[in-house]
Amino acid sequence: MSGTLALTEQLIARASVTPDDQHCQRLLIERLAALGFEHETIESNGVTNLWAVKRGVDGTAGKLLAFAGHTDVVPTGPLEQWHSAPFEPTHRDGKLYGRGAADMKASIAGFVVASEEFVAAHPAHRGSIAFLITSDEEGPATDGTIKVVEALQARGERMDYCIVGEPTSSARLGDMVKNGRRGSMSGKLIVKGVQGHIAYPHLAKNPVHLLAPALAELVAERWDDGNEYFPPTTWQVSNIHSGTGATNVIAGHADVMFNFRFSTASTVEGLQARVHAILDKHKLDYDLQWTVSGLPFLTPRGDLSNALAAAIRDETGVTTELSTTGGTSDGRFIARICPQVIEFGPLNASIHKTDEHIEVAHIEPLKNVYRRVLEQLIA
């Protein structure tokens, strides 16, 4: 059994459902300390975070390449729907099954072993290696990576490159990497009316009827045209609720929850202003609360994306695609202190599902890609 596969199985065997790390990071610390990494643990509201650094011979003047990942996993769902116990690593048909196999314990194991091999081959490496690991990525993400980033910001520390081990591959290992992510902003809208008997609409004010024209305009609005890296911004309704459940009562208010996924072609302030303008145009009496979950970030083509593309091509023969599709990731926090953030990891078809798995044949190539990037950028 390869060292990468063995470490992946050790991590899967720990039921680290958010925010419980189940001592996964302790296992990583033991491996990294043996390589000469200095580490610190940052805990916040039950979340465990790890920042570990091994300086190169150039010290703080050299480039720093970080790996960012999460030891936490999503809940298993109904156990009876799994064909094997989710926290007992199981081999079947050339695949390794277990919660977190693809998202993202194989990636973490891969970068740890890649670092071990790199340090052994390049003991006088010029640049520095770092790990930023959290147990709060799959949950609220309020006490995880963001807390480490804030601590690093406070003392003036930065990264030059960061690889986030998210499972980005689609059909073949390495066919897609993420060089950015869209921002996410949600709104909770309450349109006020006047409750009344449905037989006497002149004595009431139906908020659903008042809302409908504005809602149609919001749905039809083209918010931007996107750009070279991002598709156009989208606006989607997630929930609509009004009424008491009775068939003879006009509701007193209508509630709508919606979400923007927006690119660098738009701003939070600009999108909010346009929504308010449409609602005001329709003379609605309303309350609107906004929640910004993350701002968009983008890494243009550069040293990290080029090194990763070359490593993937040399290891797998695959020509990778830069993409910004999908949901948010912790890359949005890391981009505050790192100019080049790229996500790369295994196939994502089974993540968050029952019978999550990774192809065993992909585990060593994944590790080798990470090692090749280390060799290109900081040897």
Swiss-Prot record:
The active site is at residues 72, 137. It catalyses: N-succinyl-(2S,6S)-2,6-diaminopimelate + H2O = (2S,6S)-2,6-diaminopimelate + succinate. SUPFAM superfamilies: Bacterial exopeptidase dimerisation domain, Zn-dependent exopeptidases. InterPro entries: ArgE/DapE_CS (IPR001261), Bact_exopeptidase_dim_dom (IPR036264), DapE_proteobac (IPR005941), Peptidase_M20 (IPR002933), Peptidase_M20_dimer (IPR011650), Peptidase_M20A (IPR050072). Zn(2+) 2 binds at residues 103, 138, 352. The keyword Translocase does not apply. Binds 2 Zn(2+) or Co(2+) ions per subunit. Its cofactor is Zn(2+); Co(2+). It holds the Pfam family M20_dimer. Transmembrane segments: none annotated. Its EC number is 3.5.1.18. Pathway: Amino-acid biosynthesis; L-lysine biosynthesis via DAP pathway; LL-2,6-diaminopimelate from (S)-tetrahydrodipicolinate (succinylase route): step 3/3. GO terms for biological process: diaminopimelate biosynthetic process; L-arginine biosynthetic process; lysine biosynthetic process via diaminopimelate. It comes from the Bacteria. GO terms for molecular function: acetylornithine deacetylase activity; cobalt ion binding; succinyl-diaminopimelate desuccinylase activity; zinc ion binding. PANTHER family: ACETYLORNITHINE DEACETYLASE (PTHR43808), N-ACETYL-L-CITRULLINE DEACETYLASE (PTHR43808:SF31). Belongs to the peptidase M20A family. DapE subfamily. Homodimer. Catalyzes the hydrolysis of N-succinyl-L,L-diaminopimelic acid (SDAP), forming succinate and LL-2,6-diaminopimelate (DAP), an intermediate involved in the bacterial biosynthesis of lysine and meso-diaminopimelic acid, an essential component of bacterial cell walls. This is Succinyl-diaminopimelate desuccinylase. The lineage of its organism: Bacteria, Pseudomonadati, Pseudomonadota, Betaproteobacteria, Burkholderiales. The gene is dapE.
